[in-house]
């Protein structure tokens, strides 16, 4: 018999891990709710036509396609195989697992536009799937935790995303992080300025890999996309623009002086910083990063990434403004902006930094140990009453040897045990044992409740 295993890039989560994940998700969920976001869910699978063409060619290749039911190769001819996967896939697959939550959200908005109040603020916490190469912090199945606003182009939404990020990380105990922000209009302006107008998509896809493959490899990739040595030479100074906004923006305005779209991007970025400061977050951990590109093709305005410092991990949040994502589904001119929290990466960072609280409050607090069938039956109503008082209580399911029952409590780190023998049952005085200190007391039932609440 073949030994069972998991697909690469996927994981099981045991109780200890799930309690931590629930704490993390609930903390962020409460922040979303505070800012007026409401929850939705969408199916794990979407029609393939909904997903393809929204993430660029590289993203499309990472979508998990679902083979058609039955004889899925029926109708496939030799020429389809020779023409490559783009011709073959539509013949054998009509559905796919969702790649992210943003595109399904756009589809949801279009299908439910008559029932939605705009601006529509939604959050969504569900798994997504990507046929990526697994490595530290990168999985094939992972949880996304998104918040988006659609139906307004107000830059207040971008500012509130930054505020929400800061509040969420403060609640989680993460203090050493930076929010990187750029604007896709600036990147379009840079393409214009170096004489490569209309090539911002290729530029963004390449720049997005800067942290992964380095500057030289990015330049080589751009050469393969038709960028000349002269154009790349003019691009290099932009990579090196560092400092605060008072230093960066004047230089950038000079570089992009002939690009109206680039100048508009600078104006938008400055307005976002002003709104953040006016909201009272003057010491925000936020910086302009002109090499931030976000490879996804649907972004049109502000783009965000969050990195936790002094930890070997990629970005833990990402998002941006998209002006016409719903347009491909027949609802044009609906602007939106959103952020996605990388729950799995944040979880790994919090584990590494030991930021999760003790799990004692979420687990069993008292184990009732009965000696025999009579004391077992006597304990049943006690369990119900203790639970009604809000005390997490278990009754060991079999009246076996007390040593085995206490071993169970020890393995589950249950702090108290209530021992009920024949004498205890008859006297109404029970032995309450503190399994951490070893102390043991004789108590009435009411005293048990009083000690554990």
From Swiss-Prot:
<dbReference type="InterPro" id="IPR045864">
    <property type="entry name" value="aa-tRNA-synth_II/BPL/LPL"/>
</dbReference>
<keyword id="KW-0963">Cytoplasm</keyword>
<dbReference type="InterPro" id="IPR004154">
    <property type="entry name" value="Anticodon-bd"/>
</dbReference>
<comment type="subunit">
    <text>Homodimer.</text>
</comment>
<protein>
    <recommendedName>
        <fullName>Histidine--tRNA ligase</fullName>
        <ecNumber>6.1.1.21</ecNumber>
    </recommendedName>
</protein>
<dbReference type="InterPro" id="IPR006195">
    <property type="entry name" value="aa-tRNA-synth_II"/>
</dbReference>
<dbReference type="GO" id="GO:0005737">
    <property type="term" value="C:cytoplasm"/>
</dbReference>
<keyword id="KW-0648">Protein biosynthesis</keyword>
<keyword id="KW-0030">Aminoacyl-tRNA synthetase</keyword>
<dbReference type="InterPro" id="IPR041715">
    <property type="entry name" value="HisRS-like_core"/>
</dbReference>
<keyword id="KW-0067">ATP-binding</keyword>
<comment type="similarity">
    <text>Belongs to the class-II aminoacyl-tRNA synthetase family.</text>
</comment>
<dbReference type="GO" id="GO:0006427">
    <property type="term" value="P:histidyl-tRNA aminoacylation"/>
</dbReference>
<dbReference type="InterPro" id="IPR033656">
    <property type="entry name" value="HisRS_anticodon"/>
</dbReference>
<dbReference type="InterPro" id="IPR004516">
    <property type="entry name" value="HisRS/HisZ"/>
</dbReference>
<dbReference type="GO" id="GO:0005524">
    <property type="term" value="F:ATP binding"/>
</dbReference>
<dbReference type="GO" id="GO:0004821">
    <property type="term" value="F:histidine-tRNA ligase activity"/>
</dbReference>
<dbReference type="Pfam" id="PF03129">
    <property type="entry name" value="HGTP_anticodon"/>
</dbReference>
<dbReference type="InterPro" id="IPR036621">
    <property type="entry name" value="Anticodon-bd_dom_sf"/>
</dbReference>
<keyword id="KW-0547">Nucleotide-binding</keyword>
<keyword id="KW-0436">Ligase</keyword>
<dbReference type="InterPro" id="IPR015807">
    <property type="entry name" value="His-tRNA-ligase"/>
</dbReference>
<dbReference type="Pfam" id="PF13393">
    <property type="entry name" value="tRNA-synt_His"/>
</dbReference>
């Amino acid at each position: 018999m073949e030994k069972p295993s998991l697909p690469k890039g996927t994981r099981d989560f045991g109780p200890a891990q799930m309690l931590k994940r629930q704490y993390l998700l609930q903390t962020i969920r409460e922040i979303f709710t505070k800012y007026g976001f409401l929850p939705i869910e969408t199916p794990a699978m979407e029609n393939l036509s909904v997903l393809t063409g929204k993430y660029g060619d590289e993203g499309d290749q990472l979508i998990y396609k679902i083979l058609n039911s039955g004889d899925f190769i029926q109708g496939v001819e030799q020429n389809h195989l020779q023409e490559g996967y783009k011709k073959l896939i539509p013949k054998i697959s009509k559905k796919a697992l969702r790649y992210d939550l943003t595109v399904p959200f756009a589809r949801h908005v279009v299908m439910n536009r008559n029932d939605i109040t705009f601006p529509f603020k939604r959050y969504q916490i569900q798994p997504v799937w990507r046929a990526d190469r697994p490595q530290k912090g990168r999985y094939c199945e992972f949880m996304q935790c998104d918040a988006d606003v659609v139906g307004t182009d107000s830059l207040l939404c971008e500012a509130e995303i930054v505020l929400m990020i800061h509040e969420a990380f403060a609640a989680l105990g993460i203090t050493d992080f930076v929010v990187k922000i750029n604007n896709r209009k600036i990147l379009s302006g840079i393409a214009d300025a170096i004489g490569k107008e209309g090539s911002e998509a290729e530029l963004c896809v390449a720049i997005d890999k800067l942290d992964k493959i380095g500057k030289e490899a990015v330049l080589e990739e751009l050469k393969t996309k038709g960028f000349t040595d002269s154009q790349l030479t003019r691009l290099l100074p932009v990579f090196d623009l560092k400092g605060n906004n008072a230093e960066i923006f004047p230089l950038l305005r000079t570089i992009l002086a002939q690009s109206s779209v680039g100048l508009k991007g600078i104006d938008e970025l400055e307005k976002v910083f002003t709104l953040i400061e006016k909201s009272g977050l003057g010491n925000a951990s936020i910086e302009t990063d002109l090499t931030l590109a976000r490879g996804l093709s649907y972004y049109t305005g502000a783009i965000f990434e969050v990195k936790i410092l002094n930890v070997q991990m990629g970005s833990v949040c990402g998002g941006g403004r998209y002006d016409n994502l719903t347009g491909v589904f027949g609802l044009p001119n609906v602007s939106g902006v959103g952020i996605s929290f990388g729950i799995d990466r944040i979880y790994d960072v919090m584990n590494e930094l030991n930021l999760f609280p003790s799990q004692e409050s979420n687990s069993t607090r008292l184990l009732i140990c009965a000696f025999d069938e009579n004391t077992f039956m006597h304990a049943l109503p006690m369990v119900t009453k203790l639970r009604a008082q809000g005390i997490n209580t278990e009754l060991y399911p079999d009246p076996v040897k007390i040593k085995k029952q206490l071993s169970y409590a020890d393995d589950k780190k249950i702090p108290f045990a209530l021992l009920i023998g024949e004498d205890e049952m008859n006297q109404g005085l029970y032995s309450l044992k503190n399994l951490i200190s070893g102390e043991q007391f004789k108590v009435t039932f009411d005293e048990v409740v009083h000690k554990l609440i």
